[in-house]
């Protein structure tokens, strides 16, 4: 048990109110919930909060597309998100929204304090403006040709093909993603948060030793490259909070989003009588932890603590970042049926299965977690059903049938029970350090010992022999005592299953009760705590996800056909001479190997045979070919004399030709039978 109760405030990153919760989101919420449940079992006062991130251009545009107000869209999203989290037994004390009176008041208050303290600057900037929609375009709402490698259909902030970063104004032939119009440059006054002013404070913070090493190392890289002032304003039209003392300026979503943590807690305080300042004042003794994904470390380790410090508020005790979820070793994919929504999963499987699997693979490092669907079935059946649940089922029946549900008055194997209970300190340390995989391994090792005890004693043999009733009761009672200890250890991970165990044991399983075995105690008849997984259940989830994707594509194509003119043929480029064409050395190449680049949303890595040598080429066709291995063995056309380009993932030694508008609409060029690797295209 803990020496004294701690006051702890825990948050998860705020899901964006513009889409469904999927299994990638759930990794973080399950991870945090397990940690919170453990802390509560140890007697600490934990307040677990979250909210929907409900502002920004994407929400405004999607609402317009759906013909509803942004308020209606975010209300619908919040209801869906709350239902999904409740379905997975995420034990939030409060789930709020950034589009709330509390958040609006806190955001304005903090902005005014930062401004008064000299940390808000203003200057005029030039931005791309959509003349048809009458709006400034965020980076991700502009597409065009990369100014570095000339790859088409690239976003306004970075190129997925060559990994270059640039400003939207550098794009060649830019176009608005919103309307398709050619944007124009327009000046506007913007407000900036003076992040460089906090460099000294942030450097001292990372030296405190409380942050994950990966985060501290990454922050050091950012310091070396130089901190920049942060644009915290957006121009109308924009769905968000208006900046005080302005007519048409709004807070950038990432300014008010983290303040949403405070707003959700303020909402909880108003409902329960908690003291808000006790948790947020500069000298607060309460602990504050943020569970986040690795993609938003920048905001939580730089901007957020700097904003808090600039307002004379406390900084987080720690920021816990995790990696992404992959499925079967690759990025989640809608077309493959692995981009699984929470609601789809819950229609087919119990939430405890995913909670257990994630826990079994989680550690305290920033590593991606692979959900291997075949391993998922095997592990759940082997661990939860065969080892844990079966330990109770093979013992409880004898107690209820032969002894009126009464456990023995004494412990048959005191030393064995003591061995199980003594593991509590180590398991508690693993929980505290978020080493959930180690918790699961430790518990399953104990489960193996408990099942070996049953196998060695063979109560089914005792039950057939006269005069061994007392021994039978003692052995089966001992097995249930061991099961009870394991159930206490697993309660933060699989609370729903353990609730059923508590019902049949007629005992509330607490960490404190580890040293209080159930002696001469009555139990109820055993009922199945968990069902075996059938691979067909996984197939059903995957198939339903694929069907959702097909239906979504059909709807988008239907809407696109209504909105777009019939002709989508690109105009012919300027005339070139035969000499210009002759400069290109086009060759036929055979695909020897093709694989996805995990760090990129668009790139595939090809190993090509050009007859007398092999080459590595990266191509941005990942969306069009989501099963790269199927390309192996086919022929493609390559620009062979293109200068090699060094990329973040390696050197690309050519360019593979394809036709189409980009994204999923790309098609590799085929060659007739009889061609050989290295043949020149003329």
From Swiss-Prot:
ATP binds at residue 334. The keyword Protein biosynthesis applies. A motif ('KMSKS' region) lies at residues 331-335. It is an enzyme of class 6 (ligase). Keywords: Aminoacyl-tRNA synthetase, ATP-binding, Cytoplasm, Ligase, Metal-binding, Nucleotide-binding, Protein biosynthesis, RNA-binding, tRNA-binding, Zinc. It comes from the Bacteria. Binds 1 zinc ion per subunit. It holds the Pfam family Anticodon_3. This is Methionine--tRNA ligase. It comes from Pasteurella multocida (strain Pm70). The gene is metG.
């Amino acid at each position: 048990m803990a020496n004294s109760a701690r006051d702890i405030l825990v948050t998860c990153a705020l899901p964006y109110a513009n889409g469904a919760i999927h299994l990638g989101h759930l990794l973080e919420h399950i991870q945090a919930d397990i940690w919170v449940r453990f802390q509560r079992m140890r007697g600490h006062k934990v307040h677990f909060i979250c909210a929907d991130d409900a502002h920004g251009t994407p929400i405004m545009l999607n609402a317009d597309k759906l013909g509803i107000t942004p308020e209606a869209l975010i209300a619908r999203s919040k209801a869906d998100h709350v239902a999904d989290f409740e379905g997975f037994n995420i034990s939030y004390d409060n789930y709020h929204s950034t589009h709330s009176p509390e958040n609006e008041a806190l955001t304005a208050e903090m902005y005014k304090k930062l401004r008064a303290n000299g940390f808000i600057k203003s200057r005029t900037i030039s931005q791309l403006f959509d003349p048809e929609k009458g709006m400034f375009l965020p980076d991700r709402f502009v597409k065009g040709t990369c100014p570095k490698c000339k790859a088409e259909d690239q976003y306004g902030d970075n190129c997925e093909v060559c990994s270059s970063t640039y400003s939207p104004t550098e794009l060649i032939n830019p176009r608005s993603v919103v309307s398709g119009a050619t944007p124009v440059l327009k000046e506007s006054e913007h407000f900036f948060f003076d992040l460089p002013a906090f460099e000294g404070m942030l450097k001292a913070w990372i030296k405190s030793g409380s942050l994950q090493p990966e985060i501290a190392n990454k922050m050091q890289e950012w310091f070396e490259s130089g901190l920049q002032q942060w644009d915290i304003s957006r121009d109308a039209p924009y769905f968000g909070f208006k900046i005080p003392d302005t007519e048409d300026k709004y807070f950038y979503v990432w300014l008010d989003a983290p303040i949403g943590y405070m707003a959700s807690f303020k909402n909880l305080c108003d409902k329960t009588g908690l003291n808000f300042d006790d948790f947020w004042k500069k000298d607060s003794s309460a602990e504050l932890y943020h569970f986040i994904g690795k993609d938003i470390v920048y905001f939580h380790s730089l901007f957020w603590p700097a904003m808090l410090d600039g307002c004379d508020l406390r900084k987080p005790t720690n920021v816990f970042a995790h990696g992404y979820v992959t499925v079967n070793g690759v990025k989640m994919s809608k077309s493959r049926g692995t981009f699984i929504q929470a609601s789809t999963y819950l229609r087919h499987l119990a939430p405890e299965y995913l909670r257990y699997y994630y826990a079994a693979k989680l550690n305290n490092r920033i590593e991606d977690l692979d959900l291997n669907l075949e391993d998922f079935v095997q592990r759940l059946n082997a661990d939860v059903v065969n080892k844990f649940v079966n330990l109770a089922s093979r013992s409880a029946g004898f107690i209820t049938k032969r002894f009126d549900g009464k456990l023995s008055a004494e412990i048959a194997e005191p030393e064995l029970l003591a061995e199980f209970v003594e593991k509590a300190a180590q398991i508690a340390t693993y929980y505290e350090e978020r080493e959930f995989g180690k918790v699961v391994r430790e518990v399953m090792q104990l489960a193996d010992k408990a099942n070996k005890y049953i196998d060695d004693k063979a109560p089914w043999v005792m039950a057939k022999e006269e005069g061994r009733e007392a021994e039978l009761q003692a052995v089966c009672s001992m097995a249930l005592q061991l099961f009870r200890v394991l159930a206490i250890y697993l309660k933060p991970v699989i609370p729903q299953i353990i609730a059923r165990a508590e019902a049949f044991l007629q005992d509330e399983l607490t960490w404190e009760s580890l040293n209080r075995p159930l002696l001469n105690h009555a139990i109820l008849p055993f009922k199945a705590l968990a069902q075996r997984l059938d691979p067909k259940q996984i197939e059903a989830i995957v198939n339903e996800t694929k069907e959702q994707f097909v239906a979504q594509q059909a709807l988008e194509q239907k809407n696109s056909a209504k909105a777009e003119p019939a002709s989508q043929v690109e105009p012919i480029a300027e005339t070139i001479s035969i000499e210009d064409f002759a400069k290109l050395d086009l060759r036929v190449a055979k695909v020897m190997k093709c694989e996805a680049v995990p760090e990129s949303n668009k790139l595939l890595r090809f190993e090509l045979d050009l007859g007398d040598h092999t080459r590595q080429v990266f191509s941005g066709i990942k969306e069009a070919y989501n099963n790269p291995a199927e390309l192996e063995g086919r022929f493609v056309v390559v620009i062979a004399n293109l200068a090699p380009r060094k990329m973040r993932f390696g050197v690309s030694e050519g360019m593979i030709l394809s036709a189409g508008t980009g994204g999923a609409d790309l098609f590799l060029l085929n060659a007739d039978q009889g061609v050989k690797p290295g043949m020149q295209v003329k």
